[in-house]
Amino acid sequence: MAAAAAAAAGDSDSWDADTFSMEDPVRKVAGGGTAGGDRWEGEDEDEDVKDNWDDDDDENKEEAEVKPEVKISEKKKIAEKIKEKERQQKKRQEEIKKRLEEPEESKVLTPEEQLADKLRLKKLQEESDLELAKETFGVNNTVYGIDAMNPSSRDDFTEFGKLLKDKITQYEKSLYYASFLEALVRDVCISLEIDDLKKITNSLTVLCSEKQKQEKQSKAKKKKKGVVPGGGLKATMKDDLADYGGYDGGYVQDYEDFM
């Protein structure tokens, strides 16, 4: 009996030893060097994928944050340009306004000259206001030809003048063309200085003299082409004989009798 009990006790101890020596599968996975601690097998892989998604979201957020900064900087540059142009236009307007209020004292102007100077400055101010409005509201002109031109140099005005001439001379056959030009020249010259008006007047005077010479030459040519009194052939022969000292030897008389 004692031997049987001892054997049973030995088997019991062996069973207990085997029981306590069993490895916990959860612990085994955890002891395999995974970063998840007490996670099941494969669970750490899911978490890694999730972490990658978070990284993508963070990158997208950073890109989204950078884009508005670029837009803001561009808008800021445009706003600064507009402000700079506004300052320049305002300065120009102030100068024009000052000249309107305080006429030049160094040069004595007649009432007509003062009026012309004020009209010219007023026109400049209106043009300045118009340009400022266009730049402020971003007006983009899509017109062509004369309306699209904004001449500033000598060459620009030369080209501008050619276009105007081609446009106006289309109607030179009209009955109202001369009166139209008279009114047009008077209106466009009203703001000019006296010296400039004299230059234009002299230019027109020279043009008028040239036209008169051409007209006289044209009338003289028409008179030469008229009928010669006394007959063309006989008069020509008399002129030829007269070149020999006026002696005809009776040949002219014989010729006339024969005719």
Swiss-Prot record:
Region (Disordered) location: 1-111, 218-247
Principal subcellular localisation of the protein: cytoplasm
SS bond list: none
One annotated GO biological process: formation of cytoplasmic translation initiation complex
Coiled-coil region: 71-136
InterPro entries: eIF3-like_dom_sf (IPR023194), eIF3j (IPR013906)
Gene Ontology terms for molecular function: identical protein binding; translation initiation factor activity
Residue positions, PTM Phosphoserine: 12, 14, 21, 128
Start and end residues of each stretch annotated as Promotes stable association with the 40S ribosome: 244-259
Modified-residue entries (Phosphotyrosine), positions: 255
Subunit structure and binding partners: Component of the eukaryotic translation initiation factor 3 (eIF-3) complex, which is composed of 13 subunits: EIF3A, EIF3B, EIF3C, EIF3D, EIF3E, EIF3F, EIF3G, EIF3H, EIF3I, EIF3J, EIF3K, EIF3L and EIF3M. The eIF-3 complex appears to include 3 stable modules: module A is composed of EIF3A, EIF3B, EIF3G and EIF3I; module B is composed of EIF3F, EIF3H, and EIF3M; and module C is composed of EIF3C, EIF3D, EIF3E, EIF3K and EIF3L. EIF3C of module C binds EIF3B of module A and EIF3H of module B, thereby linking the three modules. EIF3J is a labile subunit that binds to the eIF-3 complex via EIF3B.
Stated role: Component of the eukaryotic translation initiation factor 3 (eIF-3) complex, which is required for several steps in the initiation of protein synthesis. The eIF-3 complex associates with the 40S ribosome and facilitates the recruitment of eIF-1, eIF-1A, eIF-2:GTP:methionyl-tRNAi and eIF-5 to form the 43S pre-initiation complex (43S PIC). The eIF-3 complex stimulates mRNA recruitment to the 43S PIC and scanning of the mRNA for AUG recognition.
Record protein name field: Eukaryotic translation initiation factor 3 subunit J
Organism: Rattus norvegicus (Rat)
Chain's gene name: Eif3j
